[in-house]
């Protein structure tokens, strides 16, 4: 259904359930559940032939034959990044599932599309949460001005947060970049002085008019038959500048965090790479764009401006959850749907965490981590690698193993 393909898809599952003793006296036990899932059907005879190849490890035999992941309720799932091309660069998806692409879990046996992997032992993987996970991705705009600028957009359902991981020095020589967000404070002050309490109404009216003038020129340029003259290019630049001056400048450096609740105008700019967590909504209102919009035939300017919050943008304040020598844990977002933390560990430091009844998503920014599940095998986490930690893991220990400090992000649903 996520691909909007109505054709039936046949798949099979093989599940293994073992009883594991949890203490020396064998008084307590728990079930270790593992399995794999693959598309298409194996006949009973073919399946039996595969199982007999290694009767001591039947699940491994099938997973290797089908080239699919072994899902273990006590073990992290490694998420393979899926690159999605964009007019401004590319996105790297870790949990995205829709018609444009479906991410996969991966291990030494093979790969499995994430929605299929999550159908195994759903209660132990997700508890009562949806298979539509918190969306985790990277945004990778090219460094070229204008070409690498994202849509000026606003959301009605989607909540999202960016963590800045890289700023291209060719685009921003000082190391400080600009993300456009909210209304510009100078514009607000100007309209408050000239229009008193009516300033929001007048400002948004003028903002809309400026965008309309720019859109008219933009559409001329986007027509394939248009001869783009020097005069038309100059007009496009002038009108774009006039429209974007209504939007505020949020200065960011590597490590900075910007969050966008609903109804907040924003645009990530060229050469600024970020990791993004967001709610699993695929909607937006396009206010304007400095290139041809390929995904729809219209801009949503009037609708967006009628709903946006007419205010200056302010970056979120970080909440310090824990600090000791070589360890810092900060909560950088607390949305209605999920929270996200940044954990920094010096070399050799450890951090113990509990899953409770919530899955965790981890992604590393720098350094290297060894993740030790309560009852599973250690997993290595390198920069820009991501893990899904199932509810059934219970708890885990994370150790900073590289010569450089470890910084990783964790998101979990509410």
How should these model regions be labeled?
Residues 283-356:
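C-terminal amphipathic alpha-helical segment
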Residues 157, 167-170, 264-283, 378, ...:
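Ligand-binding loop in jelly-roll beta-barrel domains
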Residues 218-219, 225-242, 275-316, 402-414:
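Double-stranded beta-helix
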Residues 247-259, 373-393:
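Short acidic-glycine-tyrosine-enriched beta hairpin
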Residues 16, 49, 257, 263-265, ...:
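Residue-level marker of beta-strand positions
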Residues 1-223, 291-314, 340-342:
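Transition-metal
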Residues 350-351, 366-372:
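Short beta-strand segments in beta-sandwich/barrel cores
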Residues 152-155, 160-163, 249-250, 257-258, ...:
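His/acidic/aromatic-lined binding-pocket segments of jelly-roll/cupin-type domains
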């Amino acid at each position: 259904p996520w691909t909007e393909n109505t054709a039936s898809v046949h798949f099979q599952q093989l599940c293994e359930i073992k009883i594991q003793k949890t203490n020396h006296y064998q008084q307590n036990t728990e079930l270790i559940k593992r399995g794999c899932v693959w598309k298409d059907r194996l006949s009973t005879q073919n399946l039996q032939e595969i199982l007999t190849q290694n009767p001591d490890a039947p699940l491994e035999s099938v997973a290797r034959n089908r080239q699919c992941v072994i899902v273990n309720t006590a073990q992290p799932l490694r998420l393979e990044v899926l690159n999605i091309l964009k007019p401004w660069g590319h996105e790297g998806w870790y949990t995205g599932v829709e018609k444009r692409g479906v991410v996969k879990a991966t291990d030494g046996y093979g790969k499995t599309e994430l929605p299929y992997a999550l159908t195994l032992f759903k209660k132990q993987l997700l508890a009562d949460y949806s298979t539509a996970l918190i969306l985790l991705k990277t945004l990778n705009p090219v460094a070229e001005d204008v070409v690498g600028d994202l849509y000026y957009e606003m959301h009605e359902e989607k909540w999202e947060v960016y963590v800045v991981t890289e700023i291209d020095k060719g685009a921003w020589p000082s190391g400080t970049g600009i993300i456009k967000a909210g209304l510009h404070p100078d514009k607000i002050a100007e309209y408050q002085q000239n229009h008193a309490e009516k300033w929001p109404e007048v400002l948004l009216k003028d903002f809309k008019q400026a965008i309309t003038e720019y859109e008219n020129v933009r559409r001329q340029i986007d027509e394939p038959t248009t001869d783009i003259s020097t005069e038309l290019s100059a007009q496009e630049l002038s009108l774009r500048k006039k429209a974007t001056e209504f939007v505020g400048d949020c200065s960011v450096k590597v490590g900075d965090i910007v969050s966008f609740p609903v109804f907040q105008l924003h645009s990530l700019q060229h050469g600024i790479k970020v990791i993004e967590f967001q709610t699993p909504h695929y909607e937006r209102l396009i206010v304007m764009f400095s290139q041809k919009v390929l995904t729809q035939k219209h801009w949503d300017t009037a609708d967006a401006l009628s709903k946006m919050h007419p205010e200056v943008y302010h970056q979120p304040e970080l909440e310090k959850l824990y600090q000791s020598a070589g360890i810092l844990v900060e909560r950088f977002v607390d949305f209605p749907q999920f929270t996200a933390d940044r954990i920094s560990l010096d070399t050799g430091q450890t951090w113990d965490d509990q899953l409770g009844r919530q899955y965790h998503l981890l992604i590393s920014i720098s350094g290297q981590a060894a993740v030790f599940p309560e009852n599973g095998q250690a997993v290595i986490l390198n920069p820009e690698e991501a893990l899904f930690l199932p509810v059934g893991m219970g708890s885990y220990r994370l150790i900073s193993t590289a010569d450089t400090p470890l910084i990783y992000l964790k998101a979990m649903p509410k």
